[in-house]
Amino acid sequence: MGEKLDKDSILYKKRHSIAHVMAEAVLELFPNTKIAIGPPIKDGFYYDFDFEKHISEDDLLLIEHKMREILKTGSPFIREVITREQALVLFKDEPYKIDLIQNFDVTDEITIYKSHKFTDLCRGPHVDNMNKLDPKAFKLTSIAGAYWRGNERNKMLSRIYGTLWNNEKDLKAYLKLQEEIKKRDHRKLGRELNLFSVHDEIGPGLIFFHPHGARIRALIENFWREEHFKNGYDILFTPHIGKSWLWETSGHLDFYKESMFEKIEMDRSDYYVKPMNCPFHIAIYNTDKHSYRDLPFRWAELGTVYRYEKIGAIHGTMRVRGFTQDDAHIICTYEQVNFEVREVLRFAIDMWNKFGFTNLKAYLSTKPEKAVGDDDDWQMAVKVLEKALIDFNIDFDIDEGGGAFYGPKIDLKIIDSLGRAWQMTTIQFDFNLPVRFKMTYTAEDGKEKRPFMIHRALLGSIERFFGILVEHYGGAFPVWLAPLQVVIIPVNSIVEEYALEVLSRFQNEGIRIKFDNYYNMRMNAKIRQYQSKKVPYMFIIGEREVVEGKISIRTRTNEQINGLELKEALEFVKLKISNKEIL
């Protein structure tokens, strides 16, 4: 589930076809509605409508019922090619269709599909007839707002989402998965576990990390730094803003301006907050002259960048306007490229394994039609990337012509505990910026040469990765990442002295531990409370534990471990942390 569908696949055709059936049902139930577009998408389909009156999710069952009535007709889906003039007449009362037609290229073939009483402007493809659509295998799932053509200056339409599968069994499996996804939604758990918040009155897409969330983030970042030092990287810190000439030179103002925040005018100069870290790292490189003996440079930064995401695209910590990229740039010679790419891929695999992600999938994107750089360099880079994937036994697909105009790349996806693929690591050659910024080094023969530059992000963005971690573990983080690892729960005040001794011993060993001496709550209620907060271990201390000098442990998974010596309990927890174990 969740993989992108090929247009020729039967499921793609079914989803496209059911979207037309939904549009017909809506028009029968709400006759003055104007229709926009209705494509198949990952896991389902949608259609955008301009309703005369407000509708809600309460209307979805009514629409579903009408759709099933239409399906009973078994009507065919008939494709016709028409002229531009015919299309303008046919859809004269549909302003959104007219807008589409008027923006077609004059050479475009215009096709329509007819089914039952409905005709739509559509390229297809579709199933042959409605008998191919199982009436028990689809469900309308939600309604959301969507701007026409995705432009916030246009009217907001009502987008009805649905899902369709080959049979009822697959539908039920999908809906069950969606229920689990809802339970694990990082926005929901973020509130329940007090991890982070968003304040639209301050600014949409800007994340406020609360103490527990900030603790997890700090643990991620500290681990990231330690691993980079172990792997021969140097850490950089660069500014958040730069003058316009920098972004003109890099090409961002020519090709990326729509995703950048507006300029800031001061001191008779224009500044922009940075959308990427690359030009700043190059500025550091160009501070000095370099010899081939100096290379490679492996420079990494947890650099905060800012991108003007549309309001409708913002989503929790996953899609934001201010975020921290775990960027690195490797600057090296031709002879060093093969080793450096292999090392980056090895580092990425190791990093993901330590965070609990062992199922990886890669995509290798090659040279597009329009590209900069030498053909030989492109061929070499693609071969190096492909060989690294093969050597590390990573399953990969080749996206022919799918590379950026400035270089080929590997995109590495992780598969989470719910089977969803998340694009995370990128290893990207850049044949553009070294030329734009005139980067050079002195080769062994004394001549000036252009270095190779490899962009590299492992986690992608810290904020997005944080959200993925929350959902992957359902908030029940591995012990090493848990913001609170242990809670001591004494049964009464009589045993507090021993409980405080345990607290001190564990604190001195760096364990994140809390002492709960609130006695107005029953013991079982306390345990349930901390289990709901996903705390890994609760130390229950009663009079027996005091007499024997031992500890009883209740885990968040409700496992009971009795009679551990204090030293044993300490070693038990420390081992779980050092091994990065998952409960």
Swiss-Prot record:
**Biological process GO terms, please?**
threonyl-tRNA aminoacylation
Which keywords are on file for this protein? Aminoacyl-tRNA synthetase, ATP-binding, Cytoplasm, Ligase, Metal-binding, Nucleotide-binding, Protein biosynthesis, RNA-binding, tRNA-binding, Zinc
Organism whose genome encodes this protein = Borrelia recurrentis (strain A1)
User: Assembly state and interactors?
Assistant: Homodimer.
What are the recorded GO MF terms, alphabetically?
A: ATP binding; metal ion binding; threonine-tRNA ligase activity; tRNA binding
- One cellular component (GO) term of this entry: cytoplasm
Which Enzyme Commission number(s) are listed?
A: 6.1.1.3
Give the residues annotated as coiled coil. Answer: none
- Region Catalytic: list its residue ranges: 185-478
The UniProt entry, under SUPFAM superfamilies, shows: Class II aaRS ABD-related, Class II aaRS and biotin synthetases, ThrRS/AlaRS common domain
Cofactor annotation comment:
Binds 1 zinc ion per subunit.
- Report the superkingdom from the record: Bacteria
**Subcellular localization:** Cytoplasm
Purpose? Catalyzes the attachment of threonine to tRNA(Thr) in a two-step reaction: L-threonine is first activated by ATP to form Thr-AMP and then transferred to the acceptor end of tRNA(Thr). Also edits incorrectly charged L-seryl-tRNA(Thr).
Q: Which family does it belong to?
A: Belongs to the class-II aminoacyl-tRNA synthetase family.
Name its co-factor(s).
Answer: Zn(2+)
Q: Which cysteines are joined by disulfide bonds?
A: none
Which Pfam family is an annotated match for this chain, by its short name? tRNA-synt_2b
Q: Does the keyword Cytoplasm apply?
A: yes
Annotated SMART domains: tRNA_SAD (SM00863)
Write down the PROSITE patterns for this protein, in alphabetical order. AA_TRNA_LIGASE_II
UniProt binding sites for Zn(2+)? 278, 329, 455
Q: What class of enzyme is it?
A: ligase
Its recorded reaction(s) are: tRNA(Thr) + L-threonine + ATP = L-threonyl-tRNA(Thr) + AMP + diphosphate + H(+)
**What name goes with this protein?**
Threonine--tRNA ligase
Gene symbol here is: thrS
**UniProt keyword Ion transport, yes or no:** no
- InterPro entries, per this entry? aa-tRNA-synt_IIb (IPR002314), aa-tRNA-synth_II (IPR006195), aa-tRNA-synth_II/BPL/LPL (IPR045864), Anticodon-bd (IPR004154), Anticodon-bd_dom_sf (IPR036621), Thr-tRNA-ligase_IIa (IPR002320), Thr/Ala-tRNA-synth_IIc_edit (IPR018163), ThrRS_anticodon (IPR047246)
